[in-house]
Amino acid sequence: TSENGVDAAHFIYVHTAQSIPEGEFHYEGAMRRAYYESKAPDMDEHGNIDTTGTKWRDNQLETSSCGPGQTWQKFMGLFDTLMQGTVTPIDANRVHLRFAFIQPKDQHETQQVMATALMEEITRQVQQDIPIWENKIYQPDPVLCDGDGPIAKHRKWFSQFYAE
């Protein structure tokens, strides 16, 4: 599951995203951080989404990982959501993956609907990823291309968590 955040191309080919998200990745000790920016149609104070294609709002996604077991994703912009994910090994071939979502109470009703849709979309995408994870085979020297993102750098960082 760890490579999903750096495998940007899979968002198009597995999850049918409209574009590949581009982000900045930073690794320091046990921490991995990433920052993404995007644009979305703006919303007025009544919760109406602009459909003219002329008004846009900046959105940000900040992610942090503490080792392989804890992640935080903070979605900011059109609506705000904080998602915490935990990955707990169950045995050699299985993990428990859990998410908790937190949203401000004072969001407009439309923002609440969009935040709920985000939770449902993340659940849908995880379900799409599961068959890939179940059939993934570790390759020590995988063939990677430019569009694969910083997978090699991520694997090097992640290797510190493997037992010798």
Question: Model-predicted segments: where are they?
Answer:
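C-terminal catalytic domain of Rieske-type non-heme iron oxygenases
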Residues: 1-164
